[in-house]
Every structure is written in C-alpha cells, then in structure tokens.
Amino acid sequence: MGVKAYLDGILGEDKACKFLKKQGFEILKRNFHSKFGEIDIIAKKDEILHFIEIKFTQNNYEVSERLDRKKLEKILKTIEFYHLKNGISSDFQIDLICIKNDVIQFCENISF
C-alpha cells in the first residue's frame, strides 16, 4: 500500500468515526489486528458490538465491490479472536461504511 492510499484510509476512518458518533455509537477500538486480518472500527451501540469495515475511494467504481466473501471470512475469524482475547461473548454484527466522494453509505448487518 502506498502512502497516499494509507493516508486516504486514515481520512476515511476519521470520517466514519465522526459519522458513527453522531449516530450514537461509542468507538471502542480502531484498527484491531490479528493473525487473521484487521477490523477497521469496533464500536458499540445498544449493547451490541459492531465490527465495521470501511471502504473509501474517490475513483469511479463502487466501493462495496471491494468487500467479498474471502474478506468477510477473515473478518469473522478476527471477530472470534477479539472475543477470545477479551473474554467476552456478546451479540455482534458486521457493518460496512462506504465513503465515495464524501458521501457516506452505512450498510448494517451485512452477510454473504
């Protein structure tokens, strides 16, 4: 990943965090890493953990096309690891935030 892509990713995550806070979410963790992958944002709302993938672009393709079954499987393994590491077992869901040209689309409880 180049420097520009890295900085764009941080900018996208910052925008997503501001959006989530306005929606009443508590941000618990950013960029949680495991040997299986990474979760961009872990947040909580109404006692439900939200594991949120952020996709950010300024190009002319659909951002949601960059999330496939393989990536979702990595996210699920990372969620399992997060639960084990923190000794918790709570309700959770996987969400997707797509940011394209400063427009935020929030897709809740995604699956394949």
Curated annotation (Swiss-Prot):
Which SUPFAM superfamilies does the entry mention? Restriction endonuclease-like (SSF52980)
The UniProt entry, under Pfam families, shows: UPF0102
GO terms of molecular function: nucleic acid binding
Domain of life assignment:
Bacteria
Q: Which Gene3D superfamilies match?
A: 3.40.1350.10
Recorded family membership = Belongs to the UPF0102 family.
List the protein's name: UPF0102 protein JJD26997_0163
Source taxonomy: Bacteria, Pseudomonadati, Campylobacterota, Epsilonproteobacteria, Campylobacterales
